[in-house]
Regions:
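Acidic, histidine-bearing metal-coordination/catalytic regions of metal-dependent phosphoesterases
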Residues: 18-151, 172-173, 370-389
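Extended active-site neighborhood of metal-dependent phosphoesterases/phosphodiesterases
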Residues: 106-136, 192-284, 317-323, 339-373
Length: 389
């Protein structure tokens, strides 16, 4: 009898512990900023259990965050606040251009569900604003002709390399950080995303400086690859999009895979050719909607740089459109080797290919584009100047 009582007590204790665990929630990763414009930005973070998510924010005039009450902006879709997610993304809209904001993130654990909409909610986790400064950001402005941004690509999961290479970088001087593809070799699970590169980015800059996210060919690989959009949603629902900053129209493009879709490496699940054709149709239409004559393209694979299928297909579909758009410069990666292709070699504009162990610091002032490519040795460092057409 005593034995059975002990078993029952253990089971009850386990049930109590489970209930307690369901009541609590922790923010385990993030936040990070993405998809910024002059009047909007998306805040994303991760919790350990399903929860609601919301952001409170305000203009930063040097006041304490809680000098006044702030509106809650929830992670919501189609009129319902999401409760079953562990990745939370909140789009802040109606912002002022070129304005400093501060923000705080919150999540409340989902502990159970009754009938209909009887969601039971537990404890709240949040970022700290009492003992340290709240997170902050500055929206893009098109009333200036100055811009500074930072480029990393082809990290392939080497988060330690990010930390080492960027250890002395003052990210507060940058308007955004461009991640130009192949941040992992293959995406098999969520933990790889965080441990391979995203945690390093959050620790170094992404809470306060927005990420411009562009996929490489390797972002198409792995059983978890189809989930990447949850971590980097965009305002048009695609991995290709445009945005404006400092009177420049940026065309952020998606390259697809580098080999034919029928290659045995893809096991019959790729449709990169059809996808690129859809992207080209979008681009042809989008060119007429660009707001500014200064134009920069971003594409992981430097179209036409090799005789691989992806390069050729991109070149045939995209390059002519970019020429017609009057692009002045394109930033690429993929080859793992720094190179500059002059105007007339691959396109009517120059193409700067950043290596896999260097970063590029880009400063725009008026019609001038100055680029510093920095590596761990002097031999890897380069200084270049370009001009808008």
């Amino acid at each position: 009898m005593k034995k059975y009582l002990l078993i029952i007590a253990a089971l009850l204790g386990s049930m109590v512990m489970t209930a307690q665990n369901m009541e609590s929630v922790k923010i385990t990763h993030g936040p990070w900023l993405c998809d910024m414009t002059e009047n909007a930005v998306t805040v994303v973070w991760k919790t350990d259990v399903p929860a609601t998510g919301w952001v409170e924010f305000t203009e930063n005039h040097g006041q304490h965050f809680y000098s006044e009450e702030h509106e809650r902006v929830y992670d919501a879709r189609f009129g319902r606040r999401l409760t079953h997610e562990t990745i939370h993304s909140v789009r802040l809209t109606g912002l002022k251009p070129g304005t400093n904001y501060m923000y705080r993130i919150f999540s409340q654990a989902l502990t159970g569900w009754g009938t209909s909409d009887d969601a039971r909610l537990g404890e709240i986790a949040s970022s700290v604003v009492y003992k340290k400064e709240p997170y902050g950001f500055r929206t893009f402005s098109n009333d200036t002709d100055e811009l500074k941004f930072f480029i990393l690509n082809d990290v392939h999961g080497r988060s330690d390399d990010i930390r080492r290479l960027c250890a002395d970088v003052d990210f507060s001087q940058y308007d955004f950080v461009l991640l130009n593809g192949d941040m992992l070799t293959t995406t098999e699970n969520e933990e790889q995303i965080f441990s391979g590169w995203l945690d390093a980015c959050v620790d170094m800059f992404a809470k306060n400086v927005p990420i411009v996210y562009v996929r490489g060919n390797h972002e198409n690989r792995g059983q978890y690859a189809d989930n990447m959009y949850k971590y980097f949603p965009s305002h048009n629902g695609q991995f290709y999009y445009t945005f404006d900053a400092a009177g420049i129209s940026f065309l952020a493009l998606d390259c697809g895979e580098d080999k034919p879709d029928s290659d045995i490496e893809y096991h019959g699940i790729l449709e990169s050719d059809k996808y690129r054709e859809q992207e080209a149709a979008w681009l042809e239409n989008e060119i007429g909607n660009l707001r500014y004559d200064k134009r920069i393209a971003i594409l992981h694979i430097p179209a036409g740089n090799s005789t691989w299928h992806g390069d050729i297909h991109l070149h045939n579909l995209i390059t002519t459109l970019l020429n017609e758009a009057g692009v002045s410069l394109m930033f690429s990666g993929h080859t793992h080797q720094y190179a500059v292709r002059k105007a007339g070699e691959l396109a009517d504009f120059p193409v700067l290919i950043n290596g896999n162990r260097t970063y590029a610091s880009v400063t725009v002032k008026g019609k001038k584009i100055h680029v510093e490519v920095i590596g761990e040795t002097k031999e890897e460092n380069h200084s270049l100047d370009f001009q808008f057409r």
